[in-house]
Regions:
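Short acidic/polar active-site loop segments enriched in Thr and Asp
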Residues: 13-14, 79
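A structural signal for isolated positions on well-ordered beta-strands in alpha/beta enzyme cores
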Residues: 16, 44-48, 113, 144, ...
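Active-site beta-loop-alpha junctions enriched in small/polar residues
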Residues: 20-22, 48-55, 84-88, 115-121, ...
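Active-site pocket-lining segments that scaffold enzyme catalytic pockets across diverse folds
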Residues: 15, 24
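Histidine/acidic residue-rich metal-binding segments in metalloenzymes
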Residues: 27-38, 60-144, 150-172, 188-199
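Glycine/threonine-rich flexible loop motifs
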Residues: 183-187
Length: 199
């Protein structure tokens, strides 16, 4: 609450926050929903139902999947569907999670904000799948791909190919330099990558 009030002093009127729903008690989601209600007349708080441990890699104490908990978060009042495909245990789980994100957003008429390709691996290409699915569903402007660090490592031929799809899909990007300038490139020798997406 103190942090939100400090942001408001700097003129911020809309804040989006990711609530980890792979805590089976949904502690952060419940707290953010309370804050959203309390501050609704002074700031717009958007909450992402976010599976930090993955939609299909996570299994809760009662057998619930991350995908089920994301959906529960949406039913409770979260504004956005979150995902983290590159963090799933295998590529297939990541791909499945992108399909689920778009399906849930369409089902509940929600926005999408995915931690997408936040890795140094130039072969992590979930932004391509997310963009294609958003384009097919006609929801591109409701989609945000956050981080997309792998695009900073991708070769020019692939990026040139991807650009046409990104333009057609009209998805949004959120670059996070304060995080990714120090999180990415840690395993590199020299020269070290900067870790931010292509801007």
């Amino acid at each position: 609450k103190i942090g939100i009030k400090k942001e408001m002093l700097h003129g911020v009127q809309l804040i989006r926050s990711h609530a980890d729903v792979t805590d089976p008690n949904l502690t952060s989601l419940k707290a953010l929903l309370e804050l959203k209600e309390e501050l609704k007349d002074t700031v717009t708080l958007q909450i992402v139902s976010f599976p930090q441990e993955g939609m299909y890699s996570y299994e809760g104490p009662h057998g619930e999947s991350g995908a089920e908990l994301v959906e529960e978060g949406l039913k409770m009042g979260a504004d956005c569907v979150g995902g983290i495909p590159h963090f799933e245990q295998c590529r297939e789980f990541g791909e499945h999670s992108m399909h689920t994100v778009v399906e849930l957003a369409s089902k509940y008429d929600k926005l999408i904000d995915v931690h997408c390709d936040e890795t140094d691996d130039p072969n992590s290409r979930y932004v391509e799948l997310l963009s294609a699915l958003a384009y097919k569903a006609g929801i591109g402007p409701k989609v945000t791909a956050s981080h997309t660090c792998s695009l900073g490592s991708a070769d020019n031929a692939y990026f040139f190919h991807l650009t046409k799809l990104l333009k057609a899909a009209h998805i949004n990007f959120a670059c996070a330099p304060t995080e990714n300038l120090y999180l990415q490139g840690r395993q590199d020798t020299f020269p070290k990558r900067r870790g931010i997406t292509r801007v």
